[in-house]
Amino acid sequence: EVIEEDGTKRFVYLLDETLELDHVGLISTNMAELLVKGITELSYRECATKVSEMTGQTISAMGVWNVIQALGEKVYNEEATLTEEYKKGHVKGEKEVPVLFEEADGVYIKLQGKDRKKEKQDKAEIKIGIAYDGWRKTGPERYALENKVVVAGFSKAKEFQEYREAVIAQEFNLDEVSQRILNAEGASWIKKVKDKSTCFQLDPFHRNKAVKEKIHERTAREAVLELLREEEIEEVFRY
């Protein structure tokens, strides 16, 4: 039993306190981590069964859902705090670079159980953002991004862009960035960036997809794609 400064009492497990273990309700951090890893690949019911077998601690599908919701709420509050600190000008990274490369995309994933009912749909878009200041070759046809920052979330466009900016600002001093290049597929939410000087660039996959959708004549389509592959941009316009 522990008595807090305000006089309230709480009970703790001394070993967990010594090891600085946190809890989500009655669930230990270790078990919560197993649930998070499991739920990315399994249904709530399958995750509950798998984790119960692995740990010897019984948890129901509803129990898994409750833990994920609690963790989600905690993450949401942390993200909101970071965003507010950024808006106040309190977030400024140490890395100073002249050019910042960015990517953004949306991926639809299927929802489960209560999540499906809550959203009144069977899938939702998770927005993804990446920022980095360069790349290096790691092998034949393989490259690794330098100082990569990754952001993901289900929030609306405005909220996501504000949080994305805050996360990037933790790593980079955005006041010192002269040019920001955003490589994306052209969705409307992607264009709602905070820095209006951002240069938008359609990535090769979505560029080629747009050509195939807009140019129906096969010969003309293949000719344009070939010119693009050869980076003959002026020839594309003349064609």
Task: Give the positions of each predicted feature.
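Catalytic center-proximal scaffold of phosphoryl-transfer enzymes
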Residues: 3-239
